[in-house]
Curated annotation (Swiss-Prot):
Region (GTase/RTPase activity): 556-692
Domain of life: Viruses
Quaternary structure and interacting proteins, as annotated: Interacts with VP1. Interacts with VP2.
MF (Gene Ontology): GTP binding; hydrolase activity; mRNA 5'-cap (guanine-N7-)-methyltransferase activity; mRNA guanylyltransferase activity; RNA binding
Keyword Methyltransferase: yes
Annotated segments matching region 2'-5'-phosphodiesterase activity: 693-835
Protein name, per record: Protein VP3
Active-site residues from the entry: 718, 720, 797, 799
Keyword terms of this UniProt record: GTP-binding, Host-virus interaction, Hydrolase, Inhibition of host innate immune response by virus, Methyltransferase, mRNA capping, mRNA processing, Multifunctional enzyme, Nucleotide-binding, Nucleotidyltransferase, RNA-binding, S-adenosyl-L-methionine, Transferase, Viral immunoevasion, Virion
Record-annotated disulphide pairs: none
Organism name: Rotavirus A (strain RVA/Human/United States/DS-1/1976/G2P1B[4]) (RV-A)
Recorded domain comment: Contains a bipartite N7-methyltransferase domain, a 2'-O-methyltransferase domain and a GTase/RTPase domain. The C-terminus contains a phosphodiesterase domain that degrades the 5'-triphosphorylated, 2'-5' linked adenylate oligomers produced by the host cell in response to IFN stimulation.
Region entry 2'-O-methyltransferase activity, spans: 246-428
Localisation per UniProt entry: Virion
Amino acid sequence: MKVLALRHSVAQIYADTQVYTHDDSKDDYENAFLISNLTTHNILYLNYSVKTLQILNKSGIAAIEIQKIDELFTLIRCNFTYDYIDDVVYLHDYSYYANNEIRTDQYWVTKTNIEDYLLPGWKLTYVGYNGSDTRGHYNFSFRCQNAATDDDVIIEYIYSNELDFQNFILKKIKERMTTSLPIARLSNRVFRDKLFKTLSVNHDKVVNVGPRNESMFTFLDHPSIKQFSNGPYLVKDTIKLKQERWLGKRLSQFDIGQYKNMLNVLTTLYQYYDMYHEKPIIYMIGSAPSYWIYDVKQYSDLKFETWDPLDTPYSNLHHKELFYINDVQKLKDNSILYIDIRTDRGNMDWKEWRKVVEGQTADNLHIAYKYLSTGKAKICCVKMTAMDVELPISAKLLHHPTTEIRSEFYLMMDIWDSKNIKRFIPKGVLYSYINNTITENVFIQQPFKLKTLKNEYVIALYALSNDLNNREDVVKLINNQKRALITVRINNTFKDEPKVGFKNIYDWTFLPTDFEMNGSIITSYDGCLGIFGLSISLASKPTGNNHLFILSGTDKYFKLDQFANHMSISRRSHQIRFSESATSYSGYIFRDLSNNNFNLIGTNVENSVSGHVYNALIYYRYNYSFDLKRWIYLHSTGKASIEGGKYYEHAPIELIYACRSAREFAKLQDDLTVLRYSNEIENYINKVYSITYADDPNYFIGIKFKNIPYKYNVKVPHLTFGVLNISEQMLPDAIAILKKFKNELFGMDITTSYTYMLSDEVYVANISGVLSTYFKIYNAFYKEQITFGQSRMFIPHVTLSFSNEKTVRIDTTKLYIDSIYLRKIKGDTVFDMTE
């Protein structure tokens, strides 16, 4: 949802839009909670409170002040990510398709012939890093830019088996126009930039597990971040290959040679970061014009020095000349060298051309070895061709996508590799490598071992759920890693499947109850965004590919109502209750009935079950930004930091009742996952709360009334307001609590409206209006370690007779309290108070 704050209402009516006017009788947190549970996508928030907007944004719900009608029109028609700290809106708006336009934020693409393969009459537009060049389109009171591009489609095409780009992009645009926006993926780039900048400032050592090509620009300015990936393809790994011949296959209709060069250099750069944790000088021989350098410089201040007879316009220092072996001495330490020398074929026949290519490859290797033979902190990536050759066994092979698969690949070596044992590699083996291998990642660092790191902050986004990892080791890492942000795939199956398929692999599934740690926040993508200064206009949908975000060691942990809070917890319930359910009271009725409370009069205002916990359990797939376990734990320890005003603390027994209702719901729905989740949350409640039951009571609290509107034959009809099991030494503490609640007890609005048989020969009158106070007193007794209340649900009633009688219904009648007392069962009254 998105909340657009206005000082005045607007005349125009928008689809899927609701107006909410700030309620001055409620505090900012309660207003935020009410807004978050509205069911429309667009909320026009009138007479707004800035504090309420802050609360929503911290909860991951985009809430923005609107000053102009143009701002309203722009934001209401598309989705966006909002940086609420810096007041920047990143639109995810593809309406530019209506201008016959596709967009990119990678400059090198604009220098290709891609426009020859677009839809007829269409063009390509460069929009800058995260759409920064579009800022001029929006003269708004906040900074606004459209981060939507088609780079995801272009890159997917490059790695696909499709050759016809026009058909490919047509299909993808049609898909985009007919499916839900994958907003988490679109906003992820904004999030990653913010995340790693924040963590790099706050932590000395940061470890990142499983980066992919989407992050290849993100880490350019973070050389100290340690990367773990799937490891490199080494020369010695070719021993498994059978020999093949030249294949010759076109991968792309438009020229992607620049993309290949960029990937080669970035792969080498990240290998240098991994070894030396600082930025090198980047030397490049050949590969002009290298327009992609412009892209790299949008993210970092890396320095390039280049040699090529052709221009390289974005190099810091370009030598418009050939590079010779003697020029190697000009290259400094703390550098990487990219060698991409290859003469144009011209009119040479293939045999003559082959000799030239192999000769140049030998020359390239000679330059590489000479560069690595002296000095320190150097890595080289050199262009190779399939030929009979000796290569160091520990050198890395690279074969990033290029326009055509022919004979070309690349070799990456550091100083140690260049001096390592060499092995003869036949030409046919190298063809086998070229024909069958595409390097899919610029990050080729070693795999991560699932062990805790003492001094590091560990980030593992979408990296650990793969069933190649041992599930128990993943859980152990999350439980024990003190500082981390780790995601795992949430179990939103209905049959409690332990693993689910994803693309061509399987992922383990997890629930919050699979982990045992305090001090960590378990939330959704949206909830995590709020913690890092971002919010989003479209909540994650339960697609089957959703992830828990687990933050350990965060200073936000105790701020219970600010981050990963209960906002939107009833939204799914409202959507169903007010559209397709039998009654809008269905949730209240079901919760009472499933706990054997059959007095449904006033069930919507006096419910005996925690609606928060019930909704968090049965609709966890729709809103798991609310960290239920943390909420339970912090209340059980009394350590919750509450910023808001009015805040109702549930009695632990209300939470137990909610689990029982959720369990009943799960059985009716045949939802095995909710069934397990409910059981495990109930077990967790019993673990963190020391709940004792007065199932063998020796005292009770009685309430005597001045008026009873029914016939009765008991001596003194009274409401048993709970039973206790206490020693005589605890009587003063129990009496003190009753005295403390005197005004609230006598202020209860108690009513009755019918009689019924509670059991055989127990004839009673119903009582309404006491549950809220009962649970407050329950909490007070619990905190003083006084055993109060039974294991079965408290059903307030007044016993009228110990015989079978017919039900009587009367108009709702108010009952007036005469006295409240504490009495020993089958004994004397030890305390009595009147108003």
